Amino acid sequence: MTQAVLKELAKAELHCHLDGSLSLPAIRKLANMADIILPSSDKELRKYVIAPAQTESLVDYLKTFEFIRPLLQTKEALRFAAYDVARQAALENVIYIEIRFAPELSMDKGLTASDTVLAVLEGLADAQKEFNIVARALVCGMRQSSHKTTKDIIKHIVDLAPKGLVGFDFAGDEFSYPTDSLVDLIQEVKRSGYPMTLHAGECGCAKHIADSLNLGIKRMGHVTALTGQRDLIKRFVEEDAVAEMCLTSNLQTKAASSIQSFPYQELYDAGGKITINTDNRTVSDTNLTKEYSLFVTYFGTKIEDFLVFNQNAVKASFTSDSEKDTLLHKLQENYDSYLK
């Protein structure tokens, strides 16, 4: 299966972080907007915004994001950033993407949570007008933030669903702030009406995956801690949960120490619902075409598998049922030409 074919396949992505996915030209433009001086060469700039192939840990990997934070402190910057990430996705035939971001990381200079979300939604709308893509936004609460901060963000976004905000996630330091410490916040999100996904099992603790299932959350990011957990995998499959897998990122952060310790094959063999995602296009120096190529190389993934994974993504997405029907039809049309 060639790179060209993999690029042409229609794709849906559920797990993509805004601040970790900005293109280098976009980073330069945003820095100019913020009067921030960057290294003159892309080779030097890449050292600041792309994590090493092997980092010490997830916490080490997350340090890369501090370089981007000052660039995303205005409505104009957030709007352009959202447009840029959706544009990148559209250029590799991603027909649906959910882009997630943490409002509080863009509130250093006076923006409110609703200001940040509205700006991102405007950028996604700009991209949708120009490209063949449906782009929606998720808000991330940060696990390490105070509950008061997160509750205030939830209050500010409660009425933004009609504008394209479709769901909520908790990201950040999962090891120090486990899922069972977020129960009151998760209940608050549920009362707001937003469906949820959670980063779960990225730090090696399978209990966080079980805790998510106990809370009725059926979409989870990473789930690398499923490896070797036969009973939990069985439960994950039986409860119709969906895995947002991020191979390159997990190898970088050592969430998976090797291909052999990545849970894909076990989950696939058990009939689990798998989706393939970039996590952070720039920080991990990847895109969906590259991720698909890795699955072909390491797992022998076939085109018919990619169709199923993308159908899983659309069905598990937080967009409307009518939008899902349209997207599923587009997927089938695209893949039919390769499966005949």
From Swiss-Prot:
GO terms, molecular function: 2'-deoxyadenosine deaminase activity; adenosine deaminase activity; zinc ion binding
Substrates-to-products reaction catalysed? adenosine + H2O + H(+) = inosine + NH4(+); 2'-deoxyadenosine + H2O + H(+) = 2'-deoxyinosine + NH4(+)
Query: What Pfam families does this protein map onto?
Result: A_deaminase (PF00962)
Q: Which UniProt keywords apply?
A: Hydrolase, Metal-binding, Nucleotide metabolism, Zinc
In this chain, substrate is annotated as bound at 17, 19, 172
Family annotation (PANTHER family): ADENOSINE DEAMINASE
Q: Report the co-factor binding details.
A: Binds 1 zinc ion per subunit.
Q: Catalytic positions? A: 202 (proton donor)
Xref: Gene3D superfamilies: Metal-dependent hydrolases
Its biological purpose: Catalyzes the hydrolytic deamination of adenosine and 2-deoxyadenosine.
Q: What is the name of the protein in this document? A: Adenosine deaminase
Taxonomy, superkingdom: Bacteria
**EC number(s) in its UniProt entry?**
3.5.4.4
Q: Taxonomy-wise, where does this protein's organism fall, top ranks first?
A: Bacteria, Bacillati, Bacillota, Bacilli, Lactobacillales
Belongs to which family? Belongs to the metallo-dependent hydrolases superfamily. Adenosine and AMP deaminases family. Adenosine deaminase subfamily.
Q: Where does Zn(2+) bind?
A: 15, 17, 199, 279
Name the cofactor(s) required for activity, per the record: Zn(2+)
Listed InterPro entries: A_deaminase, A_deaminase_dom, Ado/ade_deaminase, Metal_Hydrolase
